Amino acid sequence: MAWNVFKFCTALRALGSIMILIVIGIIGFTYYAVVVVNYGPALLIGGVDSLLSVLVLAFFHFLLIMLLWSYFSVVVTDPGGVPTGWRPELDIEKSEGNQALIGEASVGDSSSHGVRYCRKCNQYKPPRSHHCSVCGRCILKMDHHCVWVVNCVGANNYKSFLLFLFYTFLETTVVAVSLLPIFLVFFSDGDGDITVSPGSLAASFVAFVLNIAFALSVLGFLIMHIMLVARNTTTIEAYEKHTVNWPYNVGRKTNFEQVFGSDKMYWFVPLYTEDDKKKLPALGGLDFTSRSESETEPLQSL
């Protein structure tokens, strides 16, 4: 039997908002190293150094705003719960024998495309929804419960989560590149190039190491999720290693639109247009476009 890592997620409840404070602390420390210690004072030097500082600080602050906007959008947005009294269309068409349907309903993974029922919530489960042990409820198109945002990542906040990864990678890369000269000075033998205090130099060194580590790790995570979006699947669905035909892969363009929306002007902000909310039901996590059985293809694990 495969080891189910998700059953250990209940331990994440104890972390609570501590992780949010840790994220804010890392951002604050990085801000201190980049703005207060290095590129803020460089504005007063004049010449090329000042121009470079203006460019670095402008790019840094823009990415920081987008990062924080995306991050708190994931934190505060309800990922999507099953509406009270929701029932599959099959139950509406066949109003009799409800208890029989419940007894026959699948309680397994997403590979079952029939009626699904959650014994813990005592309610029907829409397609692609899963029960989160941390949140204690079923989440629409659940991807995973993220410790960094202290929230589930589901239908309503998956786009914000992907943008958080995207802007985190860009921001940490910019920070690492901008602090690289200070990192090299840290290991220099002479004292001629050192113009800051040992404490400021140490702060810059630690900030560089933190950001290069986050940039590399987030890059891998971002690439993985781009691959998932391209095939219209989630982390949980990939973990389940389906061998059945996967009907939700409706083409790369449509797959991305079901996450980011059809208006590409909004792809890089954690918002949807009102038009997309109306014409793309997949954004709500209850109704998904699917291909016919003859057109479907197997969903392979990553």
UniProtKB/Swiss-Prot annotation:
Pfam families: DHHC. One of its GO terms (molecular function) is protein-cysteine S-palmitoyltransferase activity. It is an enzyme of class 2 (transferase). It comes from the Eukaryota. It is a multi-pass membrane protein. It catalyses: L-cysteinyl-[protein] + hexadecanoyl-CoA = S-hexadecanoyl-L-cysteinyl-[protein] + CoA. Residues 116-166 form the DHHC domain. One of its GO terms (cellular component) is cytoplasmic vesicle membrane. Its EC number is 2.3.1.225. The active site is at 146 (s-palmitoyl cysteine intermediate). The keyword Secreted does not apply. The keyword Cell inner membrane does not apply. It is found in: Cell membrane; Cytoplasmic vesicle membrane. Disulfide bonds: none annotated. Belongs to the DHHC palmitoyltransferase family. Palmitoyl acyltransferase. PANTHER family: PALMITOYLTRANSFERASE ZDHHC16 (PTHR12246). This is Probable protein S-acyltransferase 13. It comes from Arabidopsis thaliana. The gene is PAT13.
